[in-house]
């Protein structure tokens, strides 16, 4: 499960190369490196589950997050391409795209910003880490053995594919 992720938000024209690279290297290059290590083991076993945690920002974009959005969109493309490469060896590769989840990062948002975000979520609330974890558990299970190359959206309806 590739779940590492950082943000270093800034408007595009103010974003430094360091802010761009730190986010891309952690979120996308880190996924590449970890997956490369575990894929070799999975190939030998002829079975595996690779689950990448992307973000609604990779699908919808988000002002001040060109680096983060690009890294998470890249992760979804990585997921689809790798699923095509590894599927013949009984290895599934999927991603989960959480929306706004109740975390330390969302706790510090100003109340007006939280209300604005929630107005875009048909279910009218933030998601929980347990709801994302339940989706991970499903993708890791035998019940998901015919699911590969897809992104599951866990966002209360904020984005509907």
Task: For each feature predicted by the language model, list its residue ranges.
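Active-site loop immediately N-terminal to the catalytic Tyr-X3-Lys motif
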Residues: 10-13, 60-66, 88-89, 124, ...
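Alpha-helical segment proximal to the catalytic Tyr-Lys
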Residues: 40, 84-88, 145
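Residue(s) in the substrate-gating loop at a strand-loop-helix junction
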Residues: 55
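A conserved structural motif in NAD(P)-dependent oxidoreductases
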Residues: 121-132, 143
């Amino acid at each position: 499960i590739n779940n590492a992720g950082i943000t270093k938000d800034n408007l595009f024209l103010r974003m430094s190369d360091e802010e761009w690279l730190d986010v891309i290297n952690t979120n996308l290059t880190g996924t590449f490196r970890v997956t490369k290590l575990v894929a070799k083991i999975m190939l030998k076993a002829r079975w595996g589950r690779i689950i990448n945690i992307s973000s609604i920002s990779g699908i919808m974009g988000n002002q001040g997050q060109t680096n983060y959005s690009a890294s998470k969109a890249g992760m979804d493309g990585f997921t689809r391409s790798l699923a095509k490469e590894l599927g013949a060896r009984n290895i599934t590769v999927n991603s989960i795209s959480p929306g706004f989840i109740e975390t330390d990062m969302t706790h510090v948002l100003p109340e007006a910003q939280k209300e604005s975000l929630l107005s875009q979520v048909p279910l009218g609330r933030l998601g929980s880490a347990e709801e994302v974890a339940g989706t991970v558990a499903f993708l890791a299970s035998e019940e998901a053995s015919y699911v590969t190359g897809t992104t599951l959206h866990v966002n209360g309806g904020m984005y509907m594919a």
